[in-house]
Amino acid sequence: MDPDIENERIEDRKKWGHKDVEHWRAVSNVHYYTREGFYGTAILVCDGRLATVQDVPLAILKGVCLVLLGKIPEAIRHLEAFSNDQNFSLGALYALKWAHASAFNPDSKSIVEIEAEISKTARNEKTPYTSYASAAEVLYFAGEFQKAKQNLDIAGKRSTEKHAKYYCLMGWIDLGLGKKQKSTQELFEKAGGQEYPDGNIGRCKILEGHHSASEMRVAANELAISTIHFLPGHIEKAKALIMLRDWHGVMDCIVNADQQEGSNPYIEILRTTHGICFAGEVSQLNRTLQLLLKSLDDNESINHALYAKITKLIVSISGKNEKILRHARDFLIRALKLSRKPDYVALSLRIAFGLGDAREVSVLSQELIALDCEDPYAILSSVTSMLMVSRVSDARAQFDIMPAAHPKLLESPFYYLIASVLAKHSKDKSFENFRQHIENLIEMLRNQLQSFPFGIDYLLLFSSDLLYFAIEQCFDFYPLVPMKAPDDTMKLTSKMLQMIYDVAPGLAYCALQLARNCYLVSNTNAAEKWIYKALEKDDSLADAHILRAQLILDRGGKIQDADDALVTGLNFNFKLRETSLYHLIKSKTFKKRNENDEALKTLKMALQIPKKEMSNNLFVPKESADTHKISVQLELIDTLRQTKRIQDAEDTMADAMAEWAGQPEQHQLVIAQAQLYLTKGHTEKALAILRKIQPGQSNFHLSRIRMAEIYLEEKKDKRMFAACYRELLKVEPTPGSYSLLGDAFMKVQEPEDAINFYEQALKMQSKDVQLAEKIGEAYVMAHLYSKAVNFYESSMNIYKDKNMRLKLANLLLRLKNYEKCEKILRAPLDREPEPSDTETIQTHIQFLLLLAECHEMVENIPEAMKDFEKAKSLHNKIQDKTNTTGLRKEGARICNLQAELYYRRHEFPPAIEVCKQALQFYETDLKSNLLLSRIYKDENKWTLVLQPCQAVLQVDPHNDEANLILADFYYIKSEADHAMTSYITLLNKNPLHWHALFRVVELYCRKGEHHKADEFLNSARDANPRCVTEAGYSVCRGRFEWYTGDQSQALRCYSRAKDSPNVVWREKALYAIIDICLNPENEKILDADSVENAEQKTTEEAADQQSTAQVYLDLLGKVGPTERYRLAQNFVRMHTTDKNTIMATIDEFNKMAYAADKSIISVAAIYGIAKGYWLLKKQQPAKQLLKSLHGRVWNFDDAEYLEKCWLLMAEIYVGASKWEQAGTYLDQVLKYNCNSLRAFELYGQAKEKEQKYVEASKIYEKAFNTTNQKSCSFGYKLAFTLLKTRRLFLCIETCQKVLDINPQYPKIQREIMDKARGMIRTT
């Protein structure tokens, strides 16, 4: 070989192998933008480098971009300068040939000359391999991948070393040839390994094709970090994050790209996609779209293909939003000015169709007929145009012959939209045909999308505008009033809406429509959630505020809140005043205020609103023509009936039926009329009018579902309930009907039959995950747990669905198969320990929370806490990117679950700490505030209880638990009146609220109003006669009987509760029984004299009572020793005549009575010590001890034992004949307990000893009345004092009452009654 040639090749190799960072970056940029169709941007990159450096390969690439832009003369002039370049001539020649061939009138002579020159240069051995490499590069962009590969192979053979550019171009050519093997990836990795940026771009492309979003993000992130100023790296990272649906990360990438707004069109496309699909901020969206348009005008002003592509993207993700479609039209106008390509005209028709512009659709349709265009919108343009002016028969005639001429139409979703409209307006108006066409539309769209990873190309095909057209077509079949279950129409629309929302959660109107769907199936909680999601994206959405007002009224919320929502909606759209819906909701607010006349006036105003002209456009839903008029008529009828204007109501119904006769709305009216009959209790009438709807009529489906509900809920007829669904299945044997019949059998608790129908539906619709979930639930309901587990496992593997995994884990948890449950939950967590996309993070959080529950069940608390901490950490990752109300609530929920675990384990300090974390997420969170209140209450920290409790009541004034805690707070603080009011409020809502009832009995009996306490006890029994068997009621009734002196009845009540599983009521009952055992019928067996001079009988009686009390005390021992238990234990021990035992018990009480600083901490223990001294006849220390309580503030906690202390002091003074001092203490007792029978007894004794029998009789009369005149002992004392005061007839009457209670009470007859009669005879 010639030495000169060899030397040249060595120089070439040096040049090729030299790592020129700036050249590589520039070439990689140009390659990237050219592949992506941003030819103008690529030219700007070329010009930027060529202005400072002579770079022939880059100059040739500029020529390629000029050809792609259609600037042929300029491209030819530019490329001719390099056709003789020694190193790159082949590339320039191929580019020149391409340019000439692309001209409007190709110069054949020039093309022949160029081909000859190419052939000559290619055969020349002196041609350097760089020239072949350049040729391969040009041919790649020309789409001639096979020729490109041949040239690159020659370049490789002539080069002794292969470098990054070679590997990378070979990889791209392989991709162009459809090769996506591992070898292609290795080529890109080799190029990337030499720090050639386009090599890493190739890696990203391969991973994108494999749908490997996480790996793509890692690769793009490496590129973005290693070459910070290489913009395609940031773009690819953003695309990876879009694939992961991490929209917050996308915006971070846009910011990190550090590009001036509007300077780079690709960045602006990403910003616009983020704005429409996620941000949803309408006010910002206008500016975003304007920035994108400006960027294209500045960088790609003659790139009509890019204008058209972006137009299609915007239309596809618009959700048929009018504002977005009008912006899209601005982009397309620029493309059409540059080129009138048929596809662009078809796209223009699609926009006009979306805007409902029938005239423009007609004009464009005529143009498309003359053009050769295979776009479905073009093929069906004339049919579309006809349907937009109601020419149904002409449209059908054309439509029927279309598939024969264009077979591929059957794969187009748009074809099925047209078919659904024609089915809806056919003679039979078959809903089933309509529904099937919509299902086909969804299926075809999914088929088109399934091979594409989620990204720009996916969004280009998504067609949310088309889906929304299909959704609107379903509106005509919607119910007018909320139903109890979704029908097929709403299931269908919910499916499509969810598809749109999953792709573009920024489309607020989609969230609003999902809210409306939930509202119409009476799922108010879900409806509220969707309304907030809609307003989160667009708070100016007037319809969302109106629906919120509707929801507030239907849920019985505050009327003012509903009014506020109405006003807010009106502020955003004043035209709402012209709609029936606005007046309908306004009338409901008047009805809630019982302003029926104003409601009637508002409804009549609504009916006088001028009827909107019905559109001829069959693609426009009738809802836009204000079908709420029917709802107004029904509401008017209902209001007239409520106000007893029956004739007016019937006339209005007749007018409505006449107005809508023969129209589809008539059937809607029939359904609503049936609902109206039902609210009036006319079940048969409701069934009769529903039965009139026959197969083929639009509301047949809904009528049978409604009939089934009536048979089940009103008539309790399961047979007819199933028959309605069987009739549906007979008429419409579709997967939906089989599924509905399965639902019906699930509703009547017959899961085995349900499984058969679900399985049949799944055979017909094998990809339906929801059906699979229903089968699993049916297996569980049928207690076929092994089958359920196997089914969930197989379904989890088939559908790759997170819900299946969660359901399986939940079931395993219920079955106590903790090991397998943990394994199922661990698998996805271990597979991706640090997820980055929002959806995966949210799924992981659900897995972790369930795993924490699993760990708690096996007592692995440290692991459970780790699960909670990991869940919180993952949640914080999402919240760092966005800070929505929903996310804050979710963060609070996670904290609450952890706090509740601490609370269950009585670990209060960490529970308080986690509750405070929850409040940092969401400061008005109810659960955390309630839990804090509960913890402070359990810790007896009442000063801290009030703040979290009031925080709850500010948000939810009717919260029962908060009101109860507040009532207890007042009770503990001895604010009896406030406490009473709060408890009564709770009882008015729920007469069976035992805690509140117990407190009310206590408070009323202390006030001396025991008859009122009895009324509440009777109210509970009236509300539920079976409540007498409940422990709560038994303890409340026992307490009442104890206060009224009937200890035998009290004991019977308490005995019913002593074995209750409810620990609270069981303990109360047992302590009360022990107290009665030690002091039966308030008769003192033990006193100082009986201990001093113990008789055998007294000792035996005391021992028997002590033994009985001990039995019940032992039952309490199972709960565990508490302070109250130790007190009861010592009182039982003290109930003896043995002085040593009494002294030992005093020592025990001493240990409990005082704190380290000798301050009193237990009034009960002080009473125990004093009673012990009193029994041992040590009156002086007893008195000194009791006097130490002087000045102690009375409170409900100490009330019982404070009263006992005062009574004991009074008894000591009565024994010492110190009447005045005794009276002081007895008055103190009666001040806080007007029904204290022991106080009455001691007071009576004192007055008798003073021989003040009149006063004594008054006291005994109070005591006798307090016991409902059932106490023989008080009856005897009253009769005795009446005898002494010579009130003889009243005395005899009292004696008779006692004998009526207990005929075996001869003492009263012999000692009092006979004497009184004798005294009457002698006077």
Curated annotation (Swiss-Prot):
Keywords: Repeat, TPR repeat. Gene3D superfamilies: Tetratricopeptide repeat domain. It comes from the Eukaryota. PANTHER family: STI2 PROTEIN-RELATED, TETRATRICOPEPTIDE REPEAT PROTEIN 21 HOMOLOG. GO terms for cellular component: cilium; intraciliary transport particle A. This is Tetratricopeptide repeat protein 21 homolog. One of its GO terms (biological process) is protein localization to cilium. The gene is ift-139. Belongs to the TTC21 family. The keyword Electron transport does not apply. InterPro entries: ARM_TT21_2nd, ARM_TT21_4th, ARM_TT21_5th, ARM_TT21_C, ARM_TT21_N, TPR-like_helical_dom_sf, TPR_rpt, TTC21A/TTC21B. TPR repeats lie at residues 56-89, 411-444, 580-613, 667-700, 702-735, 736-768, 770-802, 804-835, 845-878, 892-925, 927-959, 961-993, 995-1027, 1031-1064, 1203-1236, 1238-1270, 1272-1305.
